[in-house]
Every structure is written in structure tokens, then in C-alpha cells.
Design a protein with these regions (language model features):
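Aromatic "clamp/platform" in nucleotide-sugar-dependent glycosyltransferases that forms part
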Residues: 241, 260
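A short helix/loop element that forms part of the nucleotide-sugar donor recognition site in Leloir-type
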Residues: 163-178, 320
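Short His-centered aromatic/hydrophobic patch
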Residues: 72-78, 97-100
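Short hydrophobic beta-strand element within catalytic cores of glycosyltransferases
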Residues: 277-280, 287
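A charged, aromatic-enriched C-terminal amphipathic alpha-helix characteristic of glycosyltransferases
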Residues: 17, 315-348
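Donor nucleotide-sugar binding/catalytic pocket of nucleotide-sugar-dependent glycosyltransferases
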Residues: 126-165
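A conserved mid-protein helix/loop that constitutes part of the nucleotide-sugar donor-binding site
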Residues: 19-27, 182-205, 218-224
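Conserved acidic donor-binding segment of nucleotide-sugar-dependent glycosyltransferases
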Residues: 292-303, 312-317
Length: 350
């Protein structure tokens, strides 16, 4: 197909999940010869895009007619499209939905604020021509409230740089903490729904394991308190936030994701790309994307079973090869590009 002009709209240049997904897509589009520009609202973060980036406000007028595709991520960019999309326009508008809105908003903000936030989100994507979910499960979730003909799904990818290493200081700190034990690791934005307390409870049953937590977030102090309550604080290392946290995967024996809810965890894809053994909660998104030969899953709220599954994963060397092969076959940057360009192409034929 001919080369496209594509505008992406994101909240900021912060290195959070939706903006990283957008960056990964821009990288692939440019690599395949398409022209991209990224519009953003907030002057914060230092995510680098391989194209022009332009700061805007809700009052800024973008000439949408110059683009084939306008692709937004998150509520404010979606609202911008809702307000500024012309009544008649050849340009096609795409939104990527990054979460299970009511489930996640209710967990984060409570019933009242979560309900209002859900209504605002659903309103914000009203005028988009195609709404892209992150999985089949998410598409089924939204098919009850949105026009299923306007829904699609594309699995995320990750562009990882295997040459990046960690600082000598961090490496020495982690190895000194690990000693002769096995190291469980995770990296994430630290929220209550990430369910890290379950690993703390399992750790009390695993004397030869240590737990490395990389990241920051609004619930960090709560999570540290849970760690102390489980009396395992001497076996948990809170390293803090680190850029490109996947650099630390080679130091981990097992990567753990005990989340209660996930859209499509980029961290799991990074672990898969590195061929790291993964132990995950048995939520639908994980079971859809990886099978029992690629990851080990455990039921939520059962620390005893989590402890058993960690020991099982440690003994299964084939998990490393299997999960890496699955990433290369199904979640590679090329597969990500192919799926999105197919959606763009179909829209432009309408």
C-alpha cells in the first residue's frame, strides 16, 4: 500500500504503558516508510519518538485533513477527537483501548468516581471509526456496550534493546541481596491491583527465595507496609523506578505478575522476549496469550499455591525456550505492525 500520513495523540511523553505502546507503533510505522507526527498535551516525561512531536492544548486546531489516520490513546486525546473531528472528513480515526474501563476505574477510584470516569471514557470514544482492544477477551468485554462492528484487537509488542545493561552499582546491590538464593523479580507501576502482597505472603513459605521490586507508584507505601506485616522485609528489595526496567531481567530467575487485572502487560512481553521464566495470576488475559507450556499460572488469593508454582517454574527449564518462541511467533514488532496496518488499510477502503 502507499505510504500513510499518521497523527498520534497522547497525553504526555511519560513512559507509561499507553505512551510506550504508541512509541512502539510509531517506530514500526516509520521503519516501514510511513510519515508520523505525535501530538501531546503535558510537558512531562522524556519518552523519545523517532519523529516530530508537537505540544497542544484542547484549544489547538489540528488540520486533520492532512492525515490518512489519526490515532489517539487515553481519555484526554480521545476527548480532543470527540470535540474537534469534523462532521465530514476523509481521515479515519482510531483509538486503542488500554484497559477494562469499569473494572479498573472502580478498583482505582471507587464506585462513584469510577462510574463517572467510565461514562466520560465511553463518551470520549464515541466518534472514532475503529476501537482497538488489546486482546480477544477485552474485545468481548466491550462488545456488550459498543458496536462490535467497530471493534478489533491487536496484541501489543515490545521493542527491546538486548544490548542495554544495568549499572555496576545496581548489579552489585542486587547480587549482594540475592546471595545464594533464587531471585523472583517484577517491575511495574506500584498499584494495589498489582497484588504484590500475595508474593510477600508466598515468600514466607519460600526460605531460599528473594523478591526484587522495581518501580514506583501511588501505593508504594501501602505495599511496603504489607511487606512489613508479612515479616519478609529483609527478603524484599525495593529498588525504585528504573528506565527500561527490562534490563534487569537477566538478573532474575523468575518474573512474577500476580495482578488482579491487566490490559495487556508490556512487562510480560519483555520477559518473554528475554526468555525469562514467568509465574502469573490465572486471569483471562494471561491464559489467552500464553499456554501452560510457556508460563506457570496460579489462582488469585492463594499464596500457598503461588509458592508451589514458583518452585515448579524454577524446575522447568523448557519455559525459557517456549516463551521466547511464542514472543517471536506471535508478539514480535512485525506482527504488531502487520495487524495495525491491516486495520488502517481496511478503514481507508470504506
Amino acid at each position: 500500500m502507499h505510504h500513510l500520513n499518521i497523527a498520534f495523540i497522547i497525553p504526555s511523553l511519560k513512559a507509561n504503558g499507553p505512551c510506550i505502546v504508541c512509541r512502539d507503533l510509531v517506530v514500526q510505522m516509520i521503519a516501514h516508510g510511513h510519515h508520523c507526527i505525535v501530538y501531546y498535551f503535558d510537558e512531562c516525561g522524556n519518552l523519545v519518538f523517532p519523529c516530530e512531536t508537537v505540544r497542544i492544548t484542547m484549544k489547538t486546531m489540528i488540520d486533520f485533513e492532512q492525515f490518512d489516520i489519526v490515532h489517539s490513546h487515553e481519555v484526554r486525546p480521545n476527548l480532543y477527537v470527540l470535540l474537534h473531528k469534523p462532521l465530514k472528513c476523509h481521515t479515519k480515526f482510531v483509538v486503542t483501548i488500554h484497559n477494562y474501563v469499569w473494572r479498573d476505574y472502580r478498583s482505582t477510584y471507587g464506585v462513584l468516581k469510577g462510574g463517572v470516569g467510565t461514562l466520560i471514557f465511553l463518551l470520549s470514544i464515541l466518534r472514532h471509526d475503529k476501537k482497538v482492544c488489546l486482546s480477544k477477551d477485552m474485545m468481548a468485554y466491550y462488545s456488550h456496550i459498543l458496536n462490535s462492528k467497530r471493534l478489533a484487537y491487536v496484541y501489543n509488542t515490545r521493542n527491546v534493546d538486548f544490548k542495554l545493561g544495568v549499572t555496576k552499582e545496581d548489579e552489585q546491590s542486587i547480587l549482594g541481596f540475592k546471595k545464594d538464593n533464587y531471585l523472583i523479580g517484577t517491575f511495574c507501576r506500584i498499584l494495589k491491583r498489582k497484588n504484590l502482597c500475595l508474593v510477600f505472603r508466598a515468600l514466607s513459605l519460600l526460605p531460599h527465595y528473594r523478591f526484587l521490586v522495581i518501580g514506583d507508584g501511588p501505593d508504594l507505601e501501602l505495599v511496603k507496609m504489607q511487606c512489613r506485616e508479612c515479616q519478609v522485609e529483609d527478603r524484599v528489595l525495593f529498588l525504585g523506578a528504573r528506565k527500561e526496567a527490562y534490563r534487569y531481567l537477566p538478573l532474575m530467575d523468575i518474573f512474577a505478575i500476580p495482578s488482579q487485572s491487566e490490559g495487556f502487560p508490556l512487562a510480560l512481553l519483555e520477559a518473554a522476549a528475554f526468555g525469562t521464566k514467568c509465574v502469573c495470576s490465572d486471569i483471562d488475559i494471561f491464559k489467552e496469550c500464553f499456554n501452560d507450556n510457556e508460563i506457570v499460572t496460579f489462582p488469585l488469593a492463594h499464596p500457598e499455591q503461588l509458592a508451589c508454582k514458583i518452585v515448579e517454574a524454577q524446575s522447568r527449564e523448557e519455559l525459557k525456550t517456549n516463551i521466547k518462541e511464542k514472543f517471536n511467533d506471535s508478539y514480535s514488532p512485525q506482527a504488531f505492525y502487520d495487524d495495525y496496518i491491516a486495520i488502517y488499510s481496511d478503514l481507508l477502503k470504506e
